[in-house]
Amino acid sequence: MARNKPLGLKIRLMKAVKSNRRVPGWVMVKTDRRVTQNYKRRNWRRSNLKA
C-alpha cells in the first residue's frame, strides 16, 4: 500500500487494527466468563476490509 495515505483512510485502517484484538481479561472476569471470544475478529488473509 502507498506510504502517503489520505487521513480518512488512515483513521479507518487504525480503527480496524484496534477492533481486531481479543477480549480483555478484565472483561472475562467482569462477565463471569460469559464473554470469552471476540466474534468480530478478522484475519488479514481470509477476509478483506472495505476501507
Curated annotation (Swiss-Prot):
Q: Could you say which protein family the record assigns here?
A: Belongs to the eukaryotic ribosomal protein eL39 family.
What gene is it encoded by?
A: rpl39e
Task: Show the HAMAP family listed in the entry.
Answer: Ribosomal_eL39
- Which Gene Ontology cellular component terms are annotated? ribonucleoprotein complex; ribosome
Q: Which keywords fit this entry according to its UniProt record?
A: Ribonucleoprotein, Ribosomal protein
* An example molecular function term from Gene Ontology annotations: structural constituent of ribosome
- What protein name does the entry list? Large ribosomal subunit protein eL39
The Gene Ontology biological process annotation of the record reads: translation
The coiled-coil segments of this chain are none
What SUPFAM superfamilies does the record point to? Ribosomal protein L39e (SSF48662)
Q: Does the keyword Ribonucleoprotein apply?
A: yes
* Superkingdom per UniProt: Archaea
